[in-house]
């Protein structure tokens, strides 16, 4: 691989990996689920699940990626010494291709809202009915498709520049800014009257509110929130040098993901409490509730623009890996024709994503199994492909991978008893515990 197909620094790898994990769900769904399921008690459950489930799976992807040092679709065949295992890599590549096709639709909405909000702050445009505005945007064919195309173009530009000059450079800029913007918004939110009641609502432990659905969400979120099971982290690890400590890097990624989820809640709930607004998650939070919320506070339009920029950064840092994986699969991680294949895959992604973009407009009445195309694609990736990928990852690493590869990649000293014990616990979880948990989460989503 050329120099530009490797990470320039450890922090670049960690920031890019954390950016891949920190997606929209961490910002607009996780805080709402936390507050609805006992606040601090839910956070404690999620933290335990993440350390026992998410981190072992994340380390498995890191081990496979760096251990093979090739594209995702070739990794499993190389390490398993049989090309039949490459099907796992193909599942991951397909999942991320489909995921980007509809994820880019939401990214496009954010770009449109950012433009409208800037115009609003400058007095060029004025909006009072945010619910009607949201419906008008997502149902307009040309706005939906144009915004989706623009978002994909941003991803093409970043990925076409390679690992160091594109993905790493973008991550080093966007991730620190994401945290800075969060801190600014949190400071403003906490300065409002009655803000602490919102903090209490979000973080106060109440184990009586933890429901079975909440526990299942925490279980699923413990690995889905880390972009595990679709070879995203595997691909990033394949660009890594041999000196980087994978365990330390994995813990850093996990902690950053948890931190962002908590910061999102601290940015939203105190302000909502101050203005007596009801909390909710999903797109309506960003595009309907928050505009109304920020309109009620001084300099609110500026803070809403900052929030949209924050969401845009979270979306882009997650989406670039979705494009990068398939570009890397085709170019075998060399920079040969990287720009050409970035454009080709980007165009194909846009074409496949057209029905999803039109799901709230001209195709809103087109239902497949009772779902819009957008919701069907989301269901396919979230409920089938990602769990299947996680299951395959756990079984392959636990049973097929040569233990010597794992010991080497995790820098385990076989003469240190404590290190060997932790390694055996990791292997035990992958072999016997995680497959059962993944199956439970999987089946529960169909009940």
What residues fall within each predicted segment?
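Helix-loop-helix connectors at the membrane interface of multi-pass transporters/channels
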Residues: 107-139, 239-243, 248, 252-260, ...
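Membrane-embedded translocation segments of transport machinery
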Residues: 2-7, 168, 172-316, 340-341
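Inter-helical loop and helix-membrane interface segments of multi-pass membrane transporters/permeases
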Residues: 4, 32-37, 67-91, 104-164, ...
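Hydrophobic, membrane-embedded alpha-helices of multi-pass small-molecule transporters
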Residues: 8, 15-25, 100, 104, ...
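Transmembrane helix-boundary motif of multi-pass solute transporters/channels
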Residues: 12-49, 231-237, 247-251, 255-256, ...
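A generic transmembrane alpha-helix motif of multi-pass inner-membrane proteins
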Residues: 145, 372-395, 418-447
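Loop-to-transmembrane helix boundary motifs in multi-pass membrane proteins
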Residues: 12-14, 20, 145-146, 256-262, ...
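Membrane-interface "cap" regions at the ends of multi-pass membrane proteins
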Residues: 1-28, 57-62, 66-79, 83-90, ...
């Amino acid at each position: 691989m050329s120099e530009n197909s490797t990470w320039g620094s450890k922090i670049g790898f960690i920031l890019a990996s954390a950016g891949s994990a920190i997606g929209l769900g961490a910002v607009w769904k996780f805080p709402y689920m936390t507050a609805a399921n006992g606040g601090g008690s839910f956070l404690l459950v999620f933290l335990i699940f993440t350390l026992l489930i998410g981190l072992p799976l994340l380390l498995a992807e890191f081990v496979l990626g760096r251990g093979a040092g090739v594209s995702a679709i070739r990794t499993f065949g190389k390490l398993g010494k049989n090309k039949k295992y490459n099907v796992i890599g193909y599942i991951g590549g397909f999942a991320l291709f489909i995921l980007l096709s509809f994820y880019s639709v939401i990214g496009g909405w954010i770009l449109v809202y950012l433009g409208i909000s800037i115009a609003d702050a400058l007095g060029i445009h004025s909006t009072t009915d945010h619910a009607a505005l949201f419906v008008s945007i997502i149902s307009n064919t040309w706005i939906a498709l144009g915004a989706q195309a623009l978002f994909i173009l941003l991803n093409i530009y970043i990925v076409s520049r390679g690992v160091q000059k594109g993905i790493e450079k973008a991550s080093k800029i966007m991730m620190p800014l994401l945290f800075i913007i969060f801190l600014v918004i949190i400071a403003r939110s906490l300065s409002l009257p009655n803000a602490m009641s919102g903090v209490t609502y979000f973080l106060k432990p109440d184990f009586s509110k933890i429901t079975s659905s909440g526990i299942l969400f925490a279980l699923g979120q413990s690995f889905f929130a880390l972009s595990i099971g679709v070879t995203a982290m595997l691909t990033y690890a394949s660009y890594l040098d041999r000196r980087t400590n994978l365990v330390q890097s994995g813990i850093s990624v996990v902690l950053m993901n948890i931190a962002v989820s908590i910061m999102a809640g601290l940015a939203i709930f105190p302000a909502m409490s101050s203005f007596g607004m009801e909390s909710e998650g999903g797109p309506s939070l960003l595009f309907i509730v928050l505009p109304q919320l920020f309109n009620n506070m001084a300099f609110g339009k500026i803070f809403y623009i900052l929030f949209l920029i924050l969401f845009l950064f979270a979306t882009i840092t997650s989406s670039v890996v979705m494009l990068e994986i398939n570009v890397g699969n085709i170019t075998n991680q060399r920079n040969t024709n990287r720009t050409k294949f970035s454009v080709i895959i980007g165009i194909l992604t846009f074409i496949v994503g057209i029905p999803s973009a039109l799901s709230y407009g001209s195709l809103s009445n087109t239902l497949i199994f009772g779902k819009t195309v957008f919701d069907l694609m989301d269901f396919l990736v979230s409920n089938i492909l990602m769990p299947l990928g996680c299951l395959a990852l756990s079984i392959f690493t636990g049973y097929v991978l040569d233990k010597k590869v794992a010991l080497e990649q995790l820098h385990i000293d076989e003469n240190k008893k404590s290190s060997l014990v932790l390694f055996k616990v990791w292997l035990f979880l992958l072999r016997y515990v995680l497959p059962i948990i993944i199956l439970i989460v999987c089946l529960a989503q169909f009940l």
